[in-house]
Amino acid sequence: KAKGVGCKGLCSKGPLVNLDKKGELYEALTVDEAEPFVKAVSEKKSYEPRLADANSSFFAKQKKIVLENSGVIDPENIEEYIARDGYVALLKAITEMSQSSVVDEVRNSGLRGRGGGGYPTGLKWQTVAKSSGAQKYVICNGDEGDPGAFMDRSVMEADPHRVIEGMAIAGYAIGADTGYLYVRAEYPLAVKMLKKAIKDAERCGLLGKNIAGTNFSFHVEVRLGAGAFVCGEETALIASIEGRRGMPRPRPPFPAMKGLFGKPTLINRSEERRVGK
């Protein structure tokens, strides 16, 4: 049975076909090769011309964390995500843990920022959580301006629910009820997947008002960026979401104290959201 899944991360090698039972990966399969490929598989043979070297020593000791579900599940099917323990972490957090204990767990994990600076994620969460103010925001930075960099794109296209779940957990931890997913407009497939994932999560009661019957509510909205490299900087990103020109401003005050619409704001990259989950 043929099944469509999200990107496996080997974008330059596509189209890819993975045979689960045999653990074989085939690369650059064309339409013309479909018939001989199916014939070889039906005869329980390997289609040597396109057999990828996925079991090389380079990959042998690698363990997928952020891309754990990528290329395994259908990103448009919330049931498949749930079947792989999707949203279990969120439900555990909001029903069994206090906000401070969630922050402590992230701090103890040693997770750091994925934008280059390596700032401790848990410390950032703690700072926003302790900031005064009834209204706080969560922003997921899914924009990347480096030419040929598709890290965020592949993450959001292949496993959007994991990004959303990570945002919701962060929202609970810091006391926020609203999150923004900042995605560049040049990623139409990622935008499509994220918007569908948000609707499906709301339909299942895993996002929106009173999640899973608790007092915790969290809403997520997708905001499109114009592809400006400078909007990778936190304050420029905030200005863009607010509808202003994406220009950095002097700091302090830092976004954790005064960010989106002047309120305490937590900003993390999409990779952090998934690892934090």
Enumerate the predicted regions with their spans.
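Feature of Fe-S/electron-transfer and energy-metabolism proteins
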Residues: K1-K277
